[in-house]
């Protein structure tokens, strides 16, 4: 396979995984596609990609949802997140902190924002969803629409897991980033 075909194949896979149901995370885009300007809930799932925090901050600043939640305990990406966050933002405390706590501190430090809820017990994709649903029930947060924001490689998996447990809500995907590879120098 030549390099361009390989790049095209990688880009096809990346576009599939990094599902975004909206062209932009905006009230206008929500209104056009779903008929409402504000989702009931937006959830950022932890991971090692800091830009997810920026996506959530932008959504919070623009009133995209009624409630904002960060989900993430300690799992296989936690130490990488700690290392990257500490390297980029040493002011954000990371030692012995859960992913949700790290992202919450980042939101506070960089944007002066605080999510409504943190879920810090999750350790993997499956219990990210089940623990989120328990939190929503426990806190009596009703929702008919939910925006999921996750590392691009895990976005579709998070969507599929939620659909196993919650079939009556509008599930809106917005991967935290999208990438494309290019061939340079042949």
Residue ranges and their predicted role:
Residues 1-186:
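A structural signal for short, hydrophobic/glycine-enriched beta-strand patches
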């Amino acid at each position: 396979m030549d390099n361009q075909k390989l790049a095209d194949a990688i880009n096809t896979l990346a576009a599939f995984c990094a599902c975004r149901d909206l062209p932009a995370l905006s009230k206008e885009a929500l209104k056009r596609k779903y008929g409402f300007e504000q989702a009931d809930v937006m959830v950022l799932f932890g991971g090692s990609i800091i830009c997810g925090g920026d996506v959530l901050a932008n959504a919070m600043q623009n009133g995209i949802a009624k409630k904002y939640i960060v989900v993430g305990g300690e799992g296989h990406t936690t130490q990488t997140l700690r290392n990257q966050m500490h390297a980029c933002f040493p002011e954000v405390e990371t030692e012995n902190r859960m992913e949700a706590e790290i992202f919450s501190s980042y939101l506070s430090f960089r944007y002066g924002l605080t999510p409504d809820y943190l879920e810090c017990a999750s350790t993997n994709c499956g219990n990210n969803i089940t623990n989120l649903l328990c939190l929503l029930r426990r806190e009596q947060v009703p929702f008919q629409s939910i925006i999921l924001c996750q590392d691009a490689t895990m976005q579709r998996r998070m969507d599929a897991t939620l659909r196993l447990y919650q079939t009556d809500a509008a599930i809106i995907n917005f991967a935290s980033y999208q990438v494309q590879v290019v061939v340079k120098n042949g």
